[in-house]
Amino acid sequence: MRGFILMKSLIEEFSCGAYVFEKGDTLDGVAEKFNTTKHVIICDNNLTSPPLLGQAVFIRRSESVITVGAADDIDGICRKYGAQKDEIYRLNKVNFIYPFMRLIVK
């Protein structure tokens, strides 16, 4: 019972859920399904290789992930989401953005 309580409190505290990888799943696909990024899933689960079939991972649901539009630029995104350019680059471990990129804007 203690493990269940710990799991429940972690899920509530971090607004996350568990996802079990199924045949055909990819990190990119699962990240898109839960409106997050592959990088967030890898870091949150300390993954060093792709999840195996049947492996459960924690998924932090984030409303702070956007898809960069064709006409978007970093300054416009910063204004729209009240974010700092350096912080967006740091969170995403990138030095530039491009259209259709999934971007953490926290």
Where are these regions (language model features)?
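Primarily a LysM-type cell-wall glycan-binding module
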Residues: 8-33, 55-81
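Alpha-helical scaffold segments
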Residues: 2-13, 45, 53-54, 92, ...
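LysM (lysin motif) carbohydrate-binding repeats in extracellular/periplasmic proteins that recognize
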Residues: 22-50, 73-101
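Generic detector of short, aliphatic-rich beta-strand segments that form the cores of beta-sheets
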Residues: 53-61, 99-106
